[in-house]
Amino acid sequence: MNKRYLQKATQGKLLIIIFIVTLWGKAVSSANHHKAHHVRTGTCEVVALHRCCNKNKIEERSQTVKCSCFPGQVAGTTRAAPSCVDASIVEQKWWCHMQPCLEGEECKVLPDRKGWSCSSGNKVKTTRVTH
C-alpha cells in the first residue's frame, strides 16, 4: 500500500510539473509573439521582402509592411520607405503628394493611377499599389 501511495504521489507531481511547463511555454510564446508583431503608433516596419527577376531581366521587388498609423493616416511611402501618410492622399491617388521618391528623383503618377514612378536620369523605378 505504501508503494502504491508513492506511485500515485509521483504521478500527481509529474502531472503538475507538465502542466506548469506547458503554461510557462505558452506564456513565453505569447510574449514573444506580441513583441515580434508590435509596431509603435505612427510607424511602419517591413515584415517580409520578396525579390526576383522576370524573363526580361527586370528586377521585381515587393514587400509586406505592418503599420500602426494615427487616426486619419494609412500606410504609404515617404522617401522610398514605408510610412504613415494622410489618408486623403491614398483615397484620391495623389501618390506624389506623399513624397515617395528619394531626393533628386522626379515623381510621376502612372497613367492608370495605380501607382507612381521615380526617375533620375535614365533610371526609372515603378511602384504599383496592390491591396
Swiss-Prot record:
Note whether Hydrolase occurs among the keywords. Answer: no
Q: What's a Pfam family in this record?
A: TAFA
Q: What is the consequence of disrupting this locus?
A: Mutant mice grow and develop normally but exhibit impairments in spatial learning and memory and impairments in short- and long-term memory, accompanied with increased level of anxiety-like behaviors in open-field test. They also show decreased level of depression-like behaviors in forced-swim test and tail-suspension test. They show neuronal loss, defects in dendritic and synaptic morphology, and apoptosis in the brain.
Gene Ontology biological-process entries? memory; visual learning
Keywords, alphabetical: Cytoplasm, Nucleus, Signal
Q: Which domain of life is it from?
A: Eukaryota
* The keyword Cytoplasm appears for this protein: yes
Provide GO CC annotations from the record: cytoplasm; nucleus
Q: Which tissues express it?
A: Mainly expressed in different brain regions, including cortex, amygdala and hippocampus (at protein level). Expressed by neurons and astrocytes.
Concerning InterPro entries, the annotation shows: Chemokine-like_TAFA (IPR020350), TAFA_chemokine-like (IPR051743)
Q: What is its main location?
A: cytoplasm
**From which residue to which does the signal peptide run?**
1-30
Q: Where is this gene product found?
A: Cytoplasm; Nucleus
What does this protein's UniProt record list under function? Has a role as neurotrophic factor involved in neuronal survival and neurobiological functions.
Family under the similarity heading: Belongs to the TAFA family.
Q: What is this protein called?
A: Chemokine-like protein TAFA-2
Species the sequence originates in: Mus musculus
